Amino acid sequence: YGPRPRECVDTMVDLTFTRPDNQVLVGNHDLACLGDIDLAEFNPAAEAAGRWTAHQLGMDHQEYLGSLPAMTIAEGYTLAHASPRSPVWEYVTSVPIATDNFGHFDTDACFIGHTHVAMFAALRPGASHAELGQLRDGDVLELSGARFLINPGSVGQPRDRDPRAAFSILDTVARTLTARRVEYDIAKTQRQMALANLPDVLMNRLSHGI
């Protein structure tokens, strides 16, 4: 969706080169830009952005993205782009969907993305269904007494009506997760998107976190 796809991929390459244990996953839009998913399946704005992005990526960017998994396990945590049941496409947005997904990973916690909404689902021992909760700036989630599905949100296009970049910090020793939100220069990003002739709807939504 953004105006600097090459720089984003280069940053991921640098992070994994300097720290080989860093984990990066491929998402549905990445796969669409590689031609593995038909861009015609996306809404018109996303399709237009995807076609523009595909033309910005060099062969080295494409090869890197094509080498990434959509799901992996690292340091005792499951990581999936969308969901453990369907790592590329499924949106975890409801109690039934979240509950069903706990049967598709074996670790105590699974980190997901795709919806661009910071949230968690907890399945406690003996419970028949998961509990859903939002992750707000400064929230600390203790990863004990339940199994968890956790979405840290999006740094580039949040969709929970908070336009600040969203991320979380995982403390693997204390087994806690701290949710964070930070301001960034949205207007600068929007100007760069305008110069690239990306769809207005994608620019405007950044101001509102939708």
Task: Please place each PLM-identified region on the residue numbering.
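Active-site environment of divalent metal-dependent phosphoester hydrolases
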Residues: 1-3, 29-34, 85-87, 111-123, ...
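Short, well-ordered secondary-structure micro-motifs
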Residues: 35-37, 90, 121-124, 190-192
